[in-house]
């Protein structure tokens, strides 16, 4: 697939390297920076800052005790899925006052991962609405904090009222292989959607 804009439904020919942009989104403190850092093969670029008094009354830290930093622009990482596919990861800031940056961050992306904490599902509604409004393919990844999954995938799907076609997977954002599985699942979903469009009657 030429992710730069082609509707071709096949993987690149041997020797040709394709790169694609993926956005990692979700609520405040859900683990986006951790996810990018766990899987990136380069030292991830992070734009975290110490949480300041400006966040008092705005950022709800009750469910993320001990969190003292926040992403103020983006996180950036890179992973080579196989010899002909490189993914560039862009993590969005989770705080609502930084959402004005999202339009630029998603420009050129093939899809998005919406990372969720099942204890705070409402925090991801805005991200889902954003991607659905822009018709950008996305999947929902349940971040299993402390190795625990508080709700199963179908319960989360029902609570978010998302299409049955949208993948819902579980992951541990701290674990490279777990995170890699999420990214591969998204790429496969995007490819499936493009194949479906290619064979659909005009």
Task: List each language-model region with its residue ranges.
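Canonical P-loop GTPase G-domain recognition
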Residues: 146-202
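Conserved nucleotide-binding/hydrolysis micro-motifs of P-loop NTPases
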Residues: 29, 95, 119-122, 145-149, ...
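A short hydrophobic beta-strand->loop->alpha-helix junction that borders the nucleotide-binding pocket
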Residues: 25, 92-93, 172-173
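Conserved G1/Walker A P-loop phosphate-binding module
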Residues: 2-64, 78-82, 86-88
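Switch II of P-loop NTPase G domains
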Residues: 68-78, 82-130
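Conserved C-terminal guanine-recognition region of P-loop GTPase G domains, centered on the G4
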Residues: 115-165
């Amino acid at each position: 697939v030429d992710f730069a804009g082609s509707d071709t439904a096949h993987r690149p020919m041997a020797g040709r390297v394709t790169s694609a942009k993926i956005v990692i989104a979700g609520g405040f403190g859900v683990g986006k920076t951790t996810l990018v850092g766990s899987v990136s093969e380069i030292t991830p670029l992070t734009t975290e800052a110490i949480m300041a008094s400006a966040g008092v009354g705005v950022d709800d830290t009750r469910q993320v005790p001990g969190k003292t930093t926040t992403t103020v622009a983006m996180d950036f990482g890179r992973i080579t899925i196989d010899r002909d596919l490189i993914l560039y990861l862009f993590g969005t800031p989770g705080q609502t006052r930084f959402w004005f940056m999202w339009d630029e961050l998603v420009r050129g992306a093939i899809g998005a991962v919406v990372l969720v904490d099942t204890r705070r599902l409402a925090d991801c509604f805005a991200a889902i609405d954003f991607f659905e409004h822009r018709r950008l393919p996305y999947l929902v990844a349940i971040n299993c904090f402390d190795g625990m999954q508080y709700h199963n995938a179908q319960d989360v799907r029902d609570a978010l009222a998302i299409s049955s076609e949208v993948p819902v997977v579980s992951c541990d954002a701290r674990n490279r292989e777990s995170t890699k599985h999420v990214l591969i699942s998204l790429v496969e979903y995007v490819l499936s959607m493009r194949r479906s469009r290619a064979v659909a009657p005009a």
